Design a protein with these regions (language model features):
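N-terminal secretory signal peptides that target proteins for export/translocation
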Residues: 1-12
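Bacterial N-terminal signal peptides
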Residues: 13-28
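Non-catalytic beta-strand/loop surface segments
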Residues: 32-73, 99-132, 169-222, 247-294, ...
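Short pre-active-site segment immediately N-terminal to the catalytic Zn-binding motif
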Residues: 72-80
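Active-site SXXK
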Residues: 81-95
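M16/insulysin-pitrilysin zinc metalloprotease superfamily fold
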Residues: 93-97, 128-159, 238, 333-391
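Non-catalytic, conformational "gating/processing" segments within enzyme and secreted inhibitor domains
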Residues: 152, 159, 180, 212-244, ...
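Non-catalytic accessory/assembly modules
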Residues: 153-157, 173-180, 387, 407, ...
């Protein structure tokens, strides 16, 4: 599975939409289930360098186990795009003890679910399983960390699978094609400009040796972070981890990441893509945002929540409620090197793309001049803080929240302090950050159009 910029943004929207339900569910829990021990992180590090974070949640005898490798598509060398995601696929092939294709079947026979994901910054593998089956799953995960068999007859056919995935998820999706075009411009000269799934011509040239080299270079305990959420404590997990993961030797000298800095655009870029599958035109504007953990992150998040975060946002009130747009949104997304800020709108029938762009930017410019009202600021901070309740109420979401930030170099203390930083955001903070990132000409405009008949 690949985590594109578009997919990540949609996931943010789904989380916010579901948080009210999650809050109600949490409030309804009996006091015995809402103990202070739930979700309080505990950490330890093994002698071979593997770092572990435990997020206890004792409401049910299940655990979510996520192993994160601090390597993603941004670490690929020129001409080898898609290699990180390709190896993700191959990690489900054979080891010395597990036949090819049996890994997920064994997880399923034990009542669990498993999956994996590749981003620019990391690759992660997870399973959700009953607590008493955890040791077996950990042994399987440790086995493929060091004993993966990359036979030619297994590797080469998988390239066809990955290429077909690109056809289905990107080349058959006009929005995904335009999303790749935007990334190529906003991140020009940086590895983020290259699609995570890779370019089709470069995928065709990947080899078994490429996969083996990638595996041996990056897949070691010293480059891994283990996040386990669920009915377990560090006192229970640590002996298991020491016995199972502790037996995995270090790979040796780990390559240092060599990413060039993300450079702001010298001038704005206008993109468009037309396709017969598009039924309604849409417009978006994307700016460079902040890196994961940047000091401006929380204020920018609050500002974008006010501008385009939902049915009480300024864009929604001024565009949707006035019949000018059928959809509008705004969000800030952090990534390790540097994230993005974007607004978008789909014009209502009879409204042109040029008109909706002008109106959306008029709303944005007014917000940049005036700043938030006290009511808007308070409501946005409450909405964002409430999303943490949704995150904590779901083992997978919680493990993802920690894993994404830990692989970007944040500490547990920094992650835990996020809610306090949101609450501390002032109107002046919002004004300062919004006027820092949403001004000037360093943006990409993108228009998705129905193909002319």
């Amino acid at each position: 599975m690949i985590l594109t910029r578009l997919a990540a943004a949609l996931r943010v929207k789904r989380c916010i939409a579901a948080m009210v339900t999650a809050m109600a569910a949490l409030i309804a829990l009996p006091a015995s289930a809402q103990t202070e021990d739930n979700w309080k992180p505990e950490t330890f590090t093994l002698a071979n360098g593997l770092t572990a974070v435990v997020l206890p949640d004792h409401r049910a005898p299940v655990v979510t186990h996520m192993l994160w490798y601090r390597v993603g598509s941004a670490d690929e060398v020129k001409g080898k795009s898609g290699l990180a995601h390709f190896l993700e696929h191959l990690m489900f092939k054979a080891t010395d003890d597990i036949p090819a294709g049996e890994f997920s079947k064994i997880v399923a026979r034990n009542g669990g679910q498993d999956n994996a994901a590749t981003s620019y910054d990391y690759t992660t593998y997870h399973f959700r399983i009953a607590k008493d089956r955890l040791p077996q799953m950990m042994r399987m995960e440790a086995d493929r960390m060091v004993h993966l068999k990359l036979d030619e007859q297994e590797v080469i056919p998988e390239l066809s699978v990955v290429r077909e995935e690109r056809r289905q998820t990107v080349e058959s999706s006009p929005a995904a094609i335009l999303d790749e075009m935007v990334s190529a411009q906003i991140y020009a000269g940086h590895p983020y400009a290259i699609p995570i799934i890779g370019h089709m011509d470069e995928l065709a040239k990947l080899t078994r040796d490429d996969a083996v080299d990638w595996y041996r270079t990056w897949y070691g305990p010293e480059n891994a972070i283990l996040v386990v959420a669920g009915d377990i404590t560090a006192a229970e997990l640590k002996p298991l981890a020491e016995n199972i993961y502790g037996a995995v030797p270090r790979r040796g000298d780990l390559k240092a990441r060599k990413w060039p800095p993300v450079q702001a655009l010298a001038k704005s870029v206008e993109l468009s893509h037309a396709d017969p599958k598009v039924s309604q035109a849409s417009w978006s504007r994307t700016w460079l945002g902040v890196a994961m953990g940047d000091g401006d992150a929380e204020a920018l998040q609050v500002g974008m929540e006010i501008l385009g975060g939902g049915r009480v946002s300024r864009l929604y009130r001024e565009l949707n409620e006035q019949g000018r747009a059928t959809m509008s949104s705004g969000y800030s997304m952090e990534m390790e090197a540097r994230g993005i800020v974007a607004i978008s709108a789909t014009p209502a029938p009879g409204v042109s793309v040029a008109a909706i762009e002008a109106e959306a930017m008029a709303v944005t410019s007014k917000f940049l001049r005036e700043g938030p009202t006290a009511q808007e600021l308070s409501r946005a901070k409450k909405m964002i803080a409430a999303s943490a309740v949704f995150t904590r109420d779901n083992q997978m979401s919680l493990a993802e929240w920690y894993g994404e930030r830990l692989t970007a170099g944040q500490t547990v203390a920094q992650i835990e302090g996020w809610e306090d930083r949101i609450r501390a955001v002032t109107a002046a903070d919002v004004m300062r950050t919004m006027n820092r990132y949403l001004v000037g000409t360093n943006y990409v405009d993108a228009v998705l159009l129905p193909e002319a008949k």
